[in-house]
UniProtKB/Swiss-Prot annotation:
The lineage of its organism: Bacteria, Pseudomonadati, Pseudomonadota, Gammaproteobacteria, Enterobacterales. This is Sulfurtransferase TusD. InterPro entries: DsrEFH-like, Sulphur_relay_DsrE/F-like, Sulphur_relay_TusD/DsrE. The gene is tusD. Keywords: Cytoplasm, Transferase, tRNA processing. SUPFAM superfamilies: DsrEFH-like.
């Protein structure tokens, strides 16, 4: 089966994002196709390059990055939700005259069209 995941919880503070990551790993381990993960609302914090967990804590941001790189999963961040929460790539940082960007490499800013496309092309869309 072909899956897409929607993550609406932040990297830390709730269990939504970590549960979504565990589910994503279970999918690929069972041979399913995970085409994309769409981070929406507070979920965009999973792409913040400046997140710095303590050395004895799990680094969820880098774990998402590794999932995307190892399994070819698109990591899409809702651009509107990201901008509201201060998450920007180089292009948006320049456009908005910000000092720097903080979007973790491997993630892409995208619109709700990416979520709509995933909904149309996947067998299942699971939200966390």
């Amino acid at each position: 089966m072909r899956f897409a995941i929607v993550v609406t919880g932040p990297a830390y503070g709730t269990q939504q994002a970590s549960s979504a990551l565990q589910f994503a790993h279970a999918l690929v381990n069972e041979g399913h196709e995970l085409s994309s993960v769409f981070f929406y609302r507070e979920g965009v914090y999973n792409a913040n390059q400046l997140t710095s967990p303590a050395s004895d804590e799990f680094d969820l941001v880098r774990a998402w990055q590794q999932l995307g790189a190892q399994h070819g999963v698109a990591l899409n961040i809702c651009v509107a939700a990201a901008l509201r929460r201060g998450i920007v790539d180089e292009t948006e940082a320049k456009r908005l005259a910000l000092a720097s960007a903080n979007l973790q490499p491997g993630f892409s800013l995208s619109g709700l069209g990416a979520l709509a496309e995933a909904s149309l092309t996947c067998d299942r869309v699971v939200q966390f």
